[in-house]
Regions:
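Conserved, aromatic- and glycine-enriched, well-ordered alpha/beta core segments
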Residues: 2-6, 13-80
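Active-site-proximal structural scaffolding
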Residues: 12-13, 125
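A charged, amphipathic interaction segment
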Residues: 71-153
Length: 153
């Protein structure tokens, strides 16, 4: 399946493809185009849009696109995924929904990846997905240790 978003990835547009590839669609193909072209290219390519305005898998209220993907694909039954969603949400928004302390660190690391001189969004995603793997492992460990809100609470 094809998935599409706007170019120049940030936290949510890195976390969503990681989530999709790892838990929903292992054969996913990701497209990133200028924001004004997303819907036209999505229609032409039969691609699912995410993290763009006015789409199902976008921001809704204080929830980010990662939240929308987690809910739509029923990944919210996993407590570690719920903790990860709180962290991603806080990193991608003003962090007022959950006030998750780990969010600032994720935002900082994600912003750093944008300044490594990587050529395009695909390279940024490929490089940064190890961070998502590590963060999900952290969330799993927090849940095993009965720290449902992370280690900083």
């Amino acid at each position: 399946m094809k998935w599409i978003t706007r170019e120049r990835v940030k936290v949510d547009r890195v976390a969503c493809p990681w989530l999709i590839k790892k838990f929903i669609d292992p054969d996913a193909e990701f497209l990133s185009v200028p924001a004004a072209q997303v819907m036209a290219v999505a229609e032409r390519e039969n691609a699912i849009p995410y993290d763009v305005k006015d789409v199902e898998l976008g921001h809704h209220g204080k929830e980010c696109s990662f939240d929308a993907v987690v809910k739509k694909y029923n990944l919210d039954r996993d407590p570690a995924m719920n903790l990860l969603a709180k962290i991603v949400n806080g990193a991608d928004t003003d962090n007022s929904l959950w006030n998750q302390p780990e969010a600032a660190g994720l935002n900082t690391v994600a912003e750093g990846f944008r300044h490594l001189g990587l050529k395009n969004d695909h390279q940024i995603n490929a490089a940064q997905w190890i961070v998502s793997d590590a963060l999900y492992a952290y969330c799993q460990e927090m849940i095993r240790g009965d720290k449902l809100d992370g280690s900083f609470r």
